[in-house]
Regions:
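STAS-typified acidic loop motif
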Residues: 18-32
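Conserved beta-strand-loop-beta-strand hairpin that lines the nucleotide-binding pocket
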Residues: 3-20, 65-175
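Conserved short strand/loop->alpha-helix "switch" segment adjacent to the catalytic nucleotide/phosphoryl-transfer site
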Residues: 34-56, 129-134
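Short, glycine/charge-rich beta-strand/loop segments that flank catalytic centers
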Residues: 54-57, 75-77
Length: 175
């Protein structure tokens, strides 16, 4: 029985053309190891640094903000796929209703901004104080938006227990 489940998962991930798949706690060591794996798999030398920077930012968000924890580390899912010369980075984790609501408004606002407005807001945040609720400088999603080749996509799906399953997907050209 276990074989059937594993084979179905294997076959599914193979069809997805996944480059990297991880589900579990995101420790500093795991982040470092996943980054090294991705670094070895990216053949586009020109865009490698920005892809890796965005990947690290996305995975740190899972570690810091996931509602599910293993010790002090967040639990989530990380998936990297490649198709038609596009690299797709996706992360997913659970959020509380309050966090999901706040984050959804923030991301919608960021996506409504022009490139110049994103740059201006980014510079303001660099010069400003660190937000109290942030584990960083509050720049993460702006960094992701600035460095990715296309606008990111996000979704917030309510789970049966009232929390939200948050997914973030970012795209890069590989040519």
């Amino acid at each position: 029985m276990e074989f059937d489940k594993l084979y179905r998962q294997y076959d599914y991930l193979k069809k997805l053309k996944s480059v990297l798949y991880y589900q579990g706690a995101v420790t500093h060591e795991i982040l470092g190891n996943l980054t090294e794996i991705l670094k070895d798999r990216i053949t586009n030398q020109k865009g490698k640094n920005k892809i890796l920077n965005v990947f690290v930012e996305m995975v740190q968000n899972v570690s810091h903000y996931s509602l599910e924890k293993e010790g002090s580390y967040g639990i989530g899912l990380i998936l990297v796929k490649e198709k038609n010369h596009i690299l797709k980075l996706s992360t997913a984790n659970l959020l509380s209703e309050e966090t999901a609501s706040t984050l959804e408004k923030k991301l919608d606002h960021f996506l409504s901004l022009s490139e110049a407005e994103v740059k201006e807001l980014y510079l303001q945040k660099i010069k400003g104080e660190r937000p109290k609720s942030s584990k960083g400088a509050g720049l993460g999603f702006l960094e992701i938006l600035r460095k990715s080749d296309f606008p990111f996509r996000s979704s917030f799906e309510k789970t049966p227990n009232g929390n939200f399953f948050f997914t973030l997907t970012v795209f890069f050209r590989l040519e």
